[in-house]
Design a protein with these regions (language model features):
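Hydrophobic alpha-helical transmembrane segments of polytopic membrane proteins
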Residues: 99-111
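Polar-ligand-bearing catalytic/cofactor-coordination segments
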Residues: 1-89, 108-187
Length: 187
């Protein structure tokens, strides 16, 4: 499931695979079925409540602007121009150099962007647990998805820091397994 759009175009999309997995479902509160759909929708509505799509767009635009300005500033330095073999921004050969600097800037910014995304996902997980008070379903859902997707339960730490937009399966299970009083960390 995911949230998309802004204002009147805002939507929560639930995949047919989640609905199919819900099926007629086990007993309420047993960790699956319709309870899982409710938990997932609560998670997505937490993203709506906190305007995560809007903040994601603003963050990406700000990061892009900073990256472009940094690339231009770096490109104006003589040593960078000499290293790339160009005479300045007006040089047609400058385009590949600017693209290279942009890619390097994206790699430098990736850990921060990924950490913010993981934080927003963890916050939405907390909200869904606060709303549903159903950690059994949260754990069962994480296990089901991990098995279906053959998730790496111990992902490479560097790859996690650089590129992971969501907490690991094990982190989400650990979060859902905390005692109920701990479920007040995010609002």
């Amino acid at each position: 499931a995911y949230v998309s759009g802004l204002g009147r175009t805002r939507r929560v999309v639930v995949y047919d695979t989640l609905l199919a997995a819900a099926g007629p479902g086990p007993e309420e509160g047993s960790g699956g079925g319709a309870d899982e759909v409710v938990l997932v929708v609560a998670h997505e509505l937490a993203h709506v409540r906190h305007r995560d799509v809007l903040w994601g767009i603003i963050g990406a635009a700000a990061l892009a602007a900073v990256s472009v300005l940094a690339a231009i500033a770096l490109f104006d330095l003589g040593p960078v121009q000499r290293a790339l073999g160009v005479s300045g921004l007006g040089d047609p050969l400058a385009t590949p150099g600017l693209l290279l600097l942009g890619a390097a800037g994206s790699l430098v910014a990736a850990p921060a962007a990924s950490a913010i995304s993981r934080w927003a996902e963890a916050r939405a997980d907390w909200v869904s647990l606060e709303v549903t008070r159903d950690p059994v379903t949260a754990v069962a859902g994480e296990r089901r998805v991990a098995l279906e997707n053959r998730a790496d339960l111990r992902p490479n730490r560097l790859l996690m820091v650089m590129f992971a937009s969501h907490p690991t399966t094990m982190a989400r299970i650990a979060q859902a397994s905390l005692p109920a009083p701990e479920l007040t960390g995010f609002r």
